[in-house]
Amino acid sequence: MTLHRRGLLGLIGAGAAGAGLPAAARSARAVAFQHGVASGDPRADGAVIWTRVTPSDPSARGIRVDWSVWRDGDASAAVAGGTVETGPERDFTVKIPVTGLQPGVEYRYAFTSGETRSPQGRVRTLPVGANPETVLAVVSCQLYPGGLFNAYDAISKLERLDAVVHLGDYIYEYGAEPGDYGMDHGAALNRAPVPAHEIVSLADYRQRHAQYKTDPDLQAAHARAAFICVWDDHEVANDTWTMGAENHTPATEGDFGARKAAALKAYFEWMPIREPEGGLTEEAIYRSFDFGDLASLLMVETRLTARNEQLTYAADMPMTAAGPDLAAFEARRNDPARDLLGDRQRDWIKTTLQASRAAGRPWQVLGNQVVMARVQGPDISKLASRLEIMALMASLKPEIRAQVQQAQQLFSLGVPFNLDSWDGYPAGRERLYAAFAEAGVEPIVLAGDSHAFWVNDLKDAG
């Protein structure tokens, strides 16, 4: 919905009418903007803008929210605006796909409900034509109890920023027990996850998203620029694949499909992202962004669209009297059926890259969740002497020593470090590399998930 001068006059009239409500009625409709504002998925003519209202009355329904977009710092000169209603059916979130804007321009936006006004946000539309420079901040894997979001504070203070690219793990599903992931710092930092248990239901996922968006540094980054996001696994559960997850137990946590549906509903409510169009399923969030004549950014989906279940060394490395059966394991790992993308998404990647190259853009960038490079586990026998290794083992607790010894045996075989990454799907990776070659491009591939900084040259099996 886009309104210009006459529409805005109508909104002013509606606000004047609301001013005549009895004080009790106005109080019942009082709200706060506790989760800030956000924008996302910019286009040349617009972007998504987002907020969430917190009503003082938890049973409230049909909360009216006005929105406006302007440029040059003059909030009274709105170029787009409108009114929407929100309520408990979408957890009081508001998401507006704004259109009718000019390309390559930074706009401001804000929301109003009753007498309460939200913070302002900034969003830059995608440029068209000549574009000498694009500045992107790339982030992933933000664990609320694991530490403070200082990086987002730094991002919010960047003088020039076109967009923030988020590669997934925007939230984590774990609980607040002392042994839960991240809780070695969470209690001391007063950042224990809410709810305190592992999240499974729609109410759980909504509450966890809400907690993350109370972080002031994350709010500041969202207000600074548009986010271009994909999920990874922890938005649902650790090591998600199409039909399940490592961190999902059907016997105690119910049907995985129901859990996934709850997680995705909360994600689309709480994130400034467009829902898939053109008859695609809600899992198919792959999409592209063109930054003028400079670059194309392709965001891909590698979790819920086509991913086969991950292999594990415990289940898929047969043991014989002579030791691990590496040949049998490699036959399973190299099964041509193993994939992360699926044919439809891979064809889309190829045609989108071809179109970018045909348009003369020199840069193509792939926003992808997991490490694409081949990464072998470290063979410590080649890094330290036998005596040094024995001393290391002696210093470890027995349960940790057993794990290290098992890893040492495995990695001496030259096997991959992480089977959840592209290394667990080498045939699918080769098909993607072939698509790059057919498109005639050598893209930059971004990856999250690993909680480490990597720079790799990507090479096919040839």
Residue ranges: model-predicted function:
Residues 5-11, 15-19, 26-462:
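Metal-dependent phosphoester/phosphodiester hydrolase catalytic core
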Residues 1-3:
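Secretory targeting signals
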